[in-house]
Regions:
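Hydrophobic/small residue at the entry helix of a nucleotide-binding pocket
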Residues: 1-2
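Glycine-rich FAD pyrophosphate-binding loop
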Residues: 11-31
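Dinucleotide-binding Rossmann-like beta1-alpha1 core, especially the glycine-rich loop
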Residues: 34-113
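Short beta-strand to alpha-helix junction loop
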Residues: 49-50, 77-87, 125-144, 287-292, ...
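Helix-loop-beta segment of a Rossmann-like dinucleotide-binding subdomain
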Residues: 67-77, 104, 111-149, 277-281, ...
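A conserved short coil-to-beta-strand element within the FAD-binding core of flavoproteins
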Residues: 153-168
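Flavin-dependent oxidoreductases
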Residues: 165, 171, 175-267, 282, ...
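C-terminal catalytic lobe of FAD-dependent flavoproteins
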Residues: 258-261, 267-273, 279-365
Length: 365
């Protein structure tokens, strides 16, 4: 999605674009995520500003491309304990709380927004600015609109193998592509050409996650849903209240072992996308293991107050994250006319339109 959004901005500014994709169609982290446009947990400052701008862009792009499935659904984080509620209260007291759309709700107020939450909780953090798109189909929808411009060419099943000159690359079919600028949006593919161009000390790491999707819920889940473990992973919630939560209310053993939080979004077909885990140590395992799914199922059922529908899909994905997690993305000129853009971490789907807009502005497109 980072590469496609660069193409989008270039075409929108009147340029001709050739997009080269290693797979026949995108099938990496850009599809294997929640489709969340996640403003609520972002760090104050540049990261929040990027996420808010990206949300504006997603909404405006969706007016032209309704098949993105954009919806301004907001999110709810149900709360059960004093320590969890204290973190939410601290979030609502932030100076940028209004920009995020934070509001602390009673359980009754939360259920008025999302009636599917019939389980046990006593309050909830509402984040009005959060939104969602359909990750499995968004790339195809964007591609169709780009092709309709007449200034966009898509070459799937090709890999860029070499930079052969200023803003010029050769692919593995032997074809050379030359332009005014080349953007290498390689996602989690950090070896090979990326290593040759950026060197062995690229400040980006790979992160593996596990997720799942269910059959249709049979009713509407009107918001995205997170659990209070998400407070432990998103920088917006850092502070004394979170320190007290971590000290006095440890995660469940499975959640701690797999560095888990609950995030949940309903798809257009009614199914629920649910996750996730975080694995940082290399080499990654190649299995998907069952304990995280059991934990997530229990948490979701406790919020819904009903059994989870059958799990239809389970998968793992890998994304690239800057080792300095405060950086929104790694953007580096690696050769004359050639830029590497990677490492947005878990914010890639959220921030990609704004990341690409920044590249376009900096390069004077």
């Amino acid at each position: 999605v980072v590469g496609t959004m660069h193409a989008w901005h270039a075409v929108s500014r009147g340029h001709e674009v050739v997009q080269i994709e290693r797979e026949s169609e995108a099938r990496g982290a850009s599809l294997r995520n929640f489709g969340q446009i996640w403003v609520s947990g972002r760090a104050g400052g540049e990261e929040l500003e990027t996420a808010l701008r990206a949300r504006e862009l997603w909404e405006s792009i969706a007016e032209r491309v309704p098949d993105l499935g954009f919806r301004a659904c907001g999110s709810l984080t149900p709360l059960r304990t004093d320590r969890e509620t204290a973190v939410a209260e601290a979030a609502v007291a932030r100076p940028d709380a209004a920009a995020r759309g934070y509001k602390l709700l009673t359980a009754a107020e939360a259920r008025a927004i999302n009636p599917a939450l019939r389980g046990d909780f006593r309050a909830a953090l509402w984040c009005e600015r959060d939104a969602a798109v359909e990750p499995r189909t968004a790339q195809l929808a964007l591609k169709r609109e780009l092709l309709a411009s007449g200034r966009y060419t898509y070459l799937g099943g090709r890999e860029v193998r070499e930079v052969v000159g200023a803003a010029s690359v050769r692919d593995d079919h032997g074809d050379v592509h030359t332009g005014d600028a080349v953007v290498l949006a390689t996602g989690a593919w950090l070896g090979g050409l990326v290593r040759e161009l950026a060197g062995p000390d690229l400040p980006v790491r790979r992160v593996r996650l596990q997720m799942m999707q269910t059959d249709a819920l049979g009713e509407k889940l009107t918001t995205s849903v997170a659990d209070a473990d998400s407070f432990r992973y998103y920088p917006a919630y850092r502070g004394e209240a979170l320190d007290a939560l971590n000290a006095g209310q440890p995660q469940a053993p499975t959640a701690a072992e797999h560095r888990m939080q609950l995030l949940m979004v309903q798809r257009r077909d009614g199914g629920l996308t649910i996750g996730d885990t975080h694995e940082y140590e290399h080499p990654f395992a190649f299995d998907t293991v069952e304990e995280p799914y059991e934990h997530l199922t229990a948490v979701v059922e406790s919020f819904l107050g009903r059994p989870l529908p059958r799990i239809r899909h389970r998968w793992a994905g890998v994304y690239a994250q800057c080792t300095d997690t405060g950086r929104v993305v790694h953007r580096q000129q690696v050769r004359d006319g050639v830029w590497l853009v990677t490492g947005p971490g878990g914010r890639g789907m959220t921030c990609s339109p704004a990341i690409a807009e920044t590249t376009a502005n900096e390069l004077g497109w």
